[in-house]
Amino acid sequence: MDHLPMPKFGPLAGLRVVFSGIEIAGPFAGQMFAEWGAEVIWIENVAWADTIRVQPNYPQLSRRNLHALSLNIFKDEGREAFLKLMETTDIFIEASKGPAFARRGITDEVLWQHNPKLVIAHLSGFGQYGTEEYTNLPAYNTIAQAFSGYLIQNGDVDQPMPAFPYTADYFSGLTATTAALAALHKARETGKGESIDIAMYEVMLRMGQYFMMDYFNGGEMCPRMTKGKDPYYAGCGLYKCADGYIVMELVGITQIEECFKDIGLAHLLGTPEIPEGTQLIHRIECPYGPLVEEKLDAWLAAHTIAEVKERFAELNIACAKVLTVPELESNPQYVARESITQWQTMDGRTCKGPNVMPKFKNNPGQIWRGMPSHGMDTAAILKNIGYSENDIQELVSKGLAKVED
């Protein structure tokens, strides 16, 4: 297979990934592949571009490094071109409502007829099968959070609250990435492709699993947080200092002992309620839990963030300032690791945002291209799979493809 023009880099160089999906969840999987060196083709509707394009800045991050193909993949010669593309594709990711592709005639079996080794990842809110009530419903971030039991665990004691921004979309996209790579490993070993059914609500069910296990195996459900503090453990969560907020985790024998000395509770160490060797203070079961919180709140309120960070570093207590977004790019850790970077958009502007992650030592990812325009690479992609100029123009004239103006 000849590849589209792009630099060779990253651990996934030589891999061809194609995705069909809008907004965040499915495309986030494509973004990860593209930043790790894969050749990633983004399929868009011919008549209507991906709705993410209406956003002023985010698409420049989420669609960088991609090749843009505008093709009607469900109709006539457009479908034929799509199936031809699948012959040279390693991973195909689609995000839609339930078994939408199968309903329109593009089943796993049809795809495998054209490429027996193809890895297919289906991403939807409720899965490819189940009950009629749910399977074909649309779903976004908050829907998946609400249906999974994840949302009800977040927020404050007074009201549940979704975790933002768009947590379920990103977790689901990462799940598609890792699952597809696992399936690809097996497909290359056996020569047989795989179909992966990723339900967003099941992804979030796993993300919310920690406290659910207490309910499933005893009937007790953890309460929600109070003003950002851990619902179970004292000294864990969000706290206010004299000049702003920190998060901390008071965990460990020595850490508790030294912290108690600082906040005036050393006399409680070694008592039946807080025996020697205590590693966590349960705010509910320990009768001194509320007192620990009261003393800690008072001590933190009397000290600046810098003072708290310095002292907690001495005591090996995990803690961090709650950074504002404007503080990120000047933070020395961000600067040292180049966590924020810049790249050029297709129209020559400079865009700033998060860098490629994680950092591969021997085969690093990179940003080589900004977001392509609607249909920008259609002609190049179709030529790559054997279409002539006349073939491409015929697809365009029939409204089955769009090329860059």
UniProtKB/Swiss-Prot annotation:
The record's keywords, sorted A to Z, are: Cytoplasm, Transferase
Which InterPro entries does the record associate with it? Answer: CoA-transferase_III, CoA-Trfase_CaiB, CoA-Trfase_fam_III, CoA-Trfase_III_dom3_sf, CoA-Trfase_III_dom_1_sf
The protein's annotated catalytic reaction(s) are:
crotonobetainyl-CoA + (R)-carnitine = crotonobetaine + (R)-carnitinyl-CoA; 4-(trimethylamino)butanoyl-CoA + (R)-carnitine = (R)-carnitinyl-CoA + 4-(trimethylamino)butanoate
Task: Please verify whether the record's keywords include Transport.
Answer: no
Q: Which GO terms describe its biological process?
A: carnitine metabolic process
One GO cellular component assignment for this chain's record is: cytoplasm
Q: Which residues are the active-site ones?
A: D169 (nucleophile)
**EC numbers, comma separated:** 2.8.3.21
Query: Example GO molecular function term?
Result: L-carnitine CoA-transferase activity
Q: Which domain of life is it from?
A: Bacteria
Which residues form each disulfide bond in the chain? none
Family annotation (Pfam families):
CoA_transf_3 (PF02515)
The residues the record assigns to binding CoA are K97, R104
Q: Where are the transmembrane segments?
A: none
- Describe its assembly: Homodimer.
**Function of the molecule:** Catalyzes the reversible transfer of the CoA moiety from gamma-butyrobetainyl-CoA to L-carnitine to generate L-carnitinyl-CoA and gamma-butyrobetaine. Is also able to catalyze the reversible transfer of the CoA moiety from gamma-butyrobetainyl-CoA or L-carnitinyl-CoA to crotonobetaine to generate crotonobetainyl-CoA.
Family recorded in the similarity comment: Belongs to the CoA-transferase III family. CaiB subfamily.
- This chain belongs to the protein called L-carnitine CoA-transferase
Q: What is the lineage of its organism?
A: Bacteria, Pseudomonadati, Pseudomonadota, Gammaproteobacteria, Enterobacterales
